[in-house]
A protein has these predicted regions:
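Short amphipathic alpha-helical segments and their helix-coil junctions
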Residues: 1-7, 41-46
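Long amphipathic alpha-helical coiled-coil
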Residues: 2-30
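Residue-level recognition of alpha-helical structural elements
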Residues: 4, 8, 31-34, 53-57, ...
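N-terminal cationic amphipathic segment used for targeting or macromolecule association
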Residues: 14-18, 39, 90
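Amphipathic alpha-helical interaction modules
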Residues: 19-55
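Low-complexity intrinsically disordered segments
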Residues: 41-92
Length: 92
């Protein structure tokens, strides 16, 4: 079985949507937890301040953060990020 960047992007997006649904459920039960606790923790995990461009490690957190926002990320953009990151990490 060959996993492509497109497959991986769709998988990341699906997992992020599932996690966003859990976060929304928590927000419905405990108002303010999303903006007060969860989003700051995700921003820290995604290294938004110290890495302007995502690394492979940061990408899942960044996809989840994007999913929590108003503009849902598209699989094509995530695919481009994965392809760029994998090309950058190939040994010389």
């Amino acid at each position: 079985m060959q996993i492509t960047a497109q497959h991986l992007a769709e998988l990341l997006l699906g997992m992020a949507r599932a996690q966003a649904a859990i976060i929304q459920g928590l927000e419905n039960e405990m108002a303010g937890i999303r903006s007060g606790r969860i989003v700051p923790a995700l921003q820290n995990t995604a290294h938004l301040r110290d890495h302007p461009n995502p690394t492979l490690t940061d990408l899942p957190s960044r996809v989840l953060l994007s999913t929590l926002g108003r503009a849902v990320p598209d699989a094509a953009g995530i695919t481009r990020d994965i392809e760029r990151l994998c090309a950058d990490s190939k040994p010389a």
